[in-house]
């Protein structure tokens, strides 16, 4: 077994009694010594298989932790169309055309990271995307991951038409005549579109995406991550990676609780999270809590506000208090952390009230 001595560096320890050190010794995947060079040399004296790395004054930091990620989605997105730098609608269309030309055999085109600001007040709609690509479905995740912008072919593939009802907690964008515009908000995006796209992904696809995310993290010095929206297929991919020795990082996850409109079904999801938490109590993966999307975001005017937005819209919360309270109470009673997304003032009040009542009930 090789023991490695790293010496001659500036090592940040995060220990208030010894914030900096010169050397560290690693053996069997664990640090056996952190301190001064001279003491490290003495600690390593007589070690049969010793490898020495001269740091030459380099700074060494503990591994970083990404406190909010979606691992499998992150890995998959590395191969998708990135629209973050699009300057305006025309530039976005040009990038989409170029991506389509680069992927002539792809049955559908997936991208993301687009922002509302470059559209200069123009509402995103299917026609703008159709002008660039009309022969294949196009799915573009917004930068905040709360909306998906699709073209006409994607609406048809999803089976969404003017008569399709809004899902619980979401909205299908419609024009003044009631026609679907190609914008899917909140659970219409995360449910209708994401669930469809997820159904097309194989276990091998998920494994490759996870491997890509882990490789990108390790290259950047990230050794731990908190996945804020874990689902069953993604958890299975994580467990496969851990079993095969491919995971490479430690993961704490929050199980996504999706609104169903059925109190029993909502609570059943908490039970599922608890079962996974108990099953994965030890090891590199654990279910730390639940994730609940109480409302949307400001950019797409889906945050639950007490006053209307400038366009006159005033959407309600994804989770009203009477539905949210029993879920939060049950998760807290099960020993699960409760992570809630709440941006609007109405949603924030709902989230805080649910927490207060859970504390009152559970102590």
Positions of predicted regions on the chain:
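Divalent metal-binding segments
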Residues: 3-7, 12, 16-268, 288, ...
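Substrate-binding cleft/loops of secretory-pathway carbohydrate-active enzymes
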Residues: 267-277
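Secondary-structure transition/capping motifs at alpha-helix termini
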Residues: 243-249, 276-283, 333-334, 356-363
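Residue-level detector of alpha-helical secondary structure
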Residues: 30, 354-357
């Amino acid at each position: 077994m090789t023991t490695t001595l790293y010496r001659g560096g500036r090592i940040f320890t995060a220990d208030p009694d010894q914030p900096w050190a010169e050397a560290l010794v690693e053996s069997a995947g664990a640090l056996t010594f952190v301190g001064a060079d001279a003491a490290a040399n003495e600690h390593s004296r007589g070690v049969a298989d010793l490898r020495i790395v001269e740091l030459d004054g380099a700074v060494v930091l503990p591994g970083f932790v990404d406190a909010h990620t979606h691992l499998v989605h992150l890995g998959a997105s590395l191969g998708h169309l990135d629209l973050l730098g699009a300057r305006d609608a025309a530039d976005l269309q040009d990038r989409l055309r170029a991506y389509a030309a680069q992927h002539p055999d792809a049955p559908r085109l997936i991208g993301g990271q687009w922002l509302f600001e470059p559209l200069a007040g123009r509402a995103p709609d299917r026609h703008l995307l159709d002008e660039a690509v009309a022969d294949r479905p196009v799915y573009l995740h917004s930068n905040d991951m709360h909306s998906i912008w699709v073209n006409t072919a994607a609406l048809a593939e999803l089976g969404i038409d003017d008569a399709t009802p809004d899902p619980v907690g979401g909205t299908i964008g419609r024009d003044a005549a009631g026609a679907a515009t190609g914008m899917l908000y909140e659970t219409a995006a995360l449910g209708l579109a994401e669930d469809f796209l997820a159904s097309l992904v194989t276990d091998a696809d998920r494994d490759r995406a996870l491997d890509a995310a882990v490789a990108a993290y390790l290259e950047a010095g990230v050794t731990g991550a908190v996945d804020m929206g874990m689902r069953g297929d993604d958890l299975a991919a994580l467990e496969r990676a851990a079993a095969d020795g491919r995971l490479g990082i430690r993961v704490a996850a929050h199980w996504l609780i999706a609104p169903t409109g059925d109190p029993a079904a909502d609570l059943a999801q908490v039970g599922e999270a608890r079962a996974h938490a108990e099953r994965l109590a030890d090891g590199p993966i654990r279910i730390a809590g639940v994730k609940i999307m109480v409302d949307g975001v400001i950019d797409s005017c889906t945050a639950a506000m007490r006053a209307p937005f400038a366009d006159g819209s005033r959407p309600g919360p994804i989770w009203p208090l009477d539905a949210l309270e029993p879920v939060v109470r049950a998760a807290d009673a099960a020993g699960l952390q409760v992570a809630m997304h709440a941006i609007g003032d109405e949603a924030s009040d709902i989230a805080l009230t649910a927490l207060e009542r859970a504390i009152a009930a559970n102590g």
